[in-house]
Amino acid sequence: MENREFILAFQVMDRIIQNNQPIFMLVWVGSVVVLIATVALGIGQLYGAGLMLVIFAALAYLLGVQLPTVIINIPLNNKLQTLDVDAISETARKLAREDFDPRWNRWNLIRAVLSSLASALLIILLFRL
């Protein structure tokens, strides 16, 4: 995909997500609330490996998914949103993409792996109950 089209496509996708889509916001914020509630309930009802599973799942998700989203991916998205791709040169578009794409994808991979780990830990916990 050419630089102009890449930036435009990402801007459109990000604009839709950041436009306070109620379902997206419910899932994104709700996942944090539910996971914190799960840990709070787990502290009172789980012990040993079960408690460790829920705590590690929460840490993986909160520190490995939510935190990088807030401090890395969203700021990168916002920086890309400021570009007027038709008003800048192809060189500027190329530099913007090179500044954005590798870092965003690296952190997105980290978020995906840690989100999968958190899910796997919670599934293991369910089978142990």
Regions found by a protein language model. Give the residues of each.
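Transmembrane helix-loop junctions in multipass membrane proteins, especially transporters and channels
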Residues: 43-50, 74, 78, 127
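Interfacial loop at the N-terminal end of multi-pass membrane proteins
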Residues: 1-29, 81-101
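Hydrophobic alpha-helical transmembrane segments
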Residues: 99-116
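Core segments of transmembrane alpha-helices
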Residues: 27-39, 112-119
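Inner-leaflet juxtamembrane helices
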Residues: 60-85
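Membrane-helix exit/interface motif
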Residues: 10-14, 31-45, 68, 72
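Interfacial segments of alpha-helical transmembrane regions
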Residues: 40-64
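Juxtamembrane boundary at the C-terminal end of a transmembrane helix
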Residues: 123-129
